[in-house]
Amino acid sequence: LIEYERGTIFAIDGGEDAPGLLAPAAGPGRDGARPATADLGRPARERFARAFDKNDKRPRVAVIITGLGLARDTSFRAIEEMPSDVTLAFSPYSDALAPLLARARDKGHEILLAVPMEPADPRRRDAGPSALSVSHSEGATRQRLQTMLGLVHSHVGIVGDLGDRFARDPVAMKPVLEELAAKGLLYVENRLETPDSGTISNGVPTASVSIWLDRDLAPEAIEREIKAAEALAKRTGS
């Protein structure tokens, strides 16, 4: 595994779904994933999830690569080279989202949108012009999120990008979780100190990072983190 662009490879506890193929891709729209909660009675997070055998009770580890889309060629290489069980998170700042998403779905990858959120040190880490900020009104936060969600399709949810200030603010996060609940999406918190994954917040299934795999990019260091993720999954049963 390698770091792609400025993205982070990390492991989270996995979910479950019935075995089968990925659902056909939905078309993009103003409000993002379409169809969502009304689609065949299943929310988008289930409709577009990568399926696995729920009767297989072995512990699971979910791996997500974030920050894709900022460099077209590197992103296509990630889609082609990563196993289809790896979830890919794409930046809304990409200028090649449509072909990247189409190829990712064709290769069987589950898709997340990496939503930029205000960091604790914005002068050192720039989340970009579309970032969600604690200074925004609830309406502005909803509008920004809806605009970003409208850029992608066939995704199961979002993962926070930076956001160690925004995501800690329950008032700021409230409209985000409400929008995700309405669209049948899940939320992945990209911070190690958050509660265990698998919880429900404002009606939204949430997961949090258990281990970062690329703190040290040396192959042997990444291998150690992978083994640590395996050990954690065996210890916790997920």
Where are these regions (language model features)?
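Active-site mouth loops of central-metabolism enzymes
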Residues: 60-67, 129-139, 214-221
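Hydrophobic faces of well-ordered beta-strands that scaffold small-molecule active sites
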Residues: 61-65, 84-90, 109-115, 156-160, ...
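Anion (oxyanion) recognition and catalysis
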Residues: 102-105, 181, 200, 234
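Catalytic domains of cell-wall/extracellular-matrix polysaccharide-remodeling enzymes
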Residues: 138-223
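Catalytic grooves of carbohydrate-active enzymes
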Residues: 165, 229-238
